[in-house]
Amino acid sequence: MKVLYILYQYLIGLPIIILITLFTAIFTIICFPWKNGKAPRAVQVFWSRSVLWFLLVPIKVTGRENVNPKQSYVFVANHQSALDVFAVYGWLPNNFKWMMKKELRKIPFVGTACAVAGHIFVDRSNPRAA
């Protein structure tokens, strides 16, 4: 069964995720450049939840009722896996901005979409400046 799951992830899930990511990035770039970092949260949630759905990753969220969407917070993800970004993005009710290494800005479409959405790129080459 595990072999079938891995085959599904690479042969079906991954190509679909690449297409969803491209579509979402292009949609964000074209439709929301004037929003000054305020691309609709629905676009971000759609992307995150779609990725996890196509990878067949179950998500169980507890304690969301303790998070006030109108209050400011600092969320810190400790990267237990590559999927924590999607889980946080898709299931936290707050409209937040990621801090990410500046190298991610160079990813075609995705880097531009992140900039349009108002995410923050950090230059980690000089720890004092970062």
Q: Where are the regions that the model predicts?
A:
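A transmembrane-helix-recognition feature enriched in membrane-embedded lipid enzymes
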Residues: 2-60, 112-113
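Soluble catalytic domains of membrane acyltransferases
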Residues: 54-130
